[in-house]
């Protein structure tokens, strides 16, 4: 919400929320997945009494993004200086391969990226690595502004390592990145769209990703919302049983709609507009659900389904000079 709808939130509430999350940081650097209403810091996805293994592989990156977005909106670099050490510890907690990509040991599967936190991806991971690169670039910029050249160089190098090595997940035949290198070695629609949206240096790969999204529009979009995998695929492994076609195993989500629309706008603006019109029409008629499918809807009034596309559409309008 802070990234895409900061103007809709009280500034002090955002600041206090960040400090509350960081207050729950463990000694090993792990930051909470969430805080309960009673103040309990919860580190793993799933119910408190039945966690889905170790903490997800994106908590550290989102913590950095949260602080960076707050500083960007407020200009409060002193706030960054005050919490910078905690952010470094959080990033150091993340498990990474020799090539710098975020990884999950196949012998110890657990939640990866939050919007696939029930999916048993293992090995080197696409989405969490994209987030790590993005967070590292943000930290490099913030440390440079704060006058810490050594830290800026460190995180710039971490981002550069991912930029050089993410190609190990590239499927040349499909022209798309795979979600993971071991388990769930499948085309990741969200991850590829986000790579474009996040400005990852793709070179010639970008044209192929955009082409895949356009050609497979009917397999990945329904009522303006986006599947994690091309229809009719489901994930090879899950951490808990999930019926194919539902939730994170084949339902369609508004969370990623803005990323896909942004990506398509570069070469197929009419197709991007079609997606956005379908999304808005569906929200007006039925409401904004967490995810949907034919004869299936889950969790109405899901805030991310609204604010993620909002942020992406604002950015698209600004970058492509749309009214």
Name each region found by the language model:
Residues 2, 6-8, 44-60, 116-131, ...:
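Solvent-exposed loop and edge beta-strand segments that line ligand/cofactor-binding
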Residues 1-101, 126-129, 254-264, 272, ...:
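Aromatic-rich carbohydrate-recognition surfaces in CAZymes
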Residues 100-119:
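Short, flexible helix-coil linker/hinge segments at the edges of structured domains or between repeats
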Residues 222-240, 249-251:
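A glycine-rich, aromatic-flanked flexible loop/lid motif
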Residues 32, 103-105, 121-125, 131-231, ...:
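Catalytic cores of carbohydrate-active enzymes
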Residues 41-42, 112-113, 282:
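A short local loop/turn or secondary-structure capping micro-motif enriched for an aromatic residue
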Residues 9-24, 77-95, 135, 139, ...:
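Extended, well-ordered alpha-helical scaffold segments
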Residues 27, 31, 111, 115, ...:
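Glycine-rich, flexible loop/turn motifs
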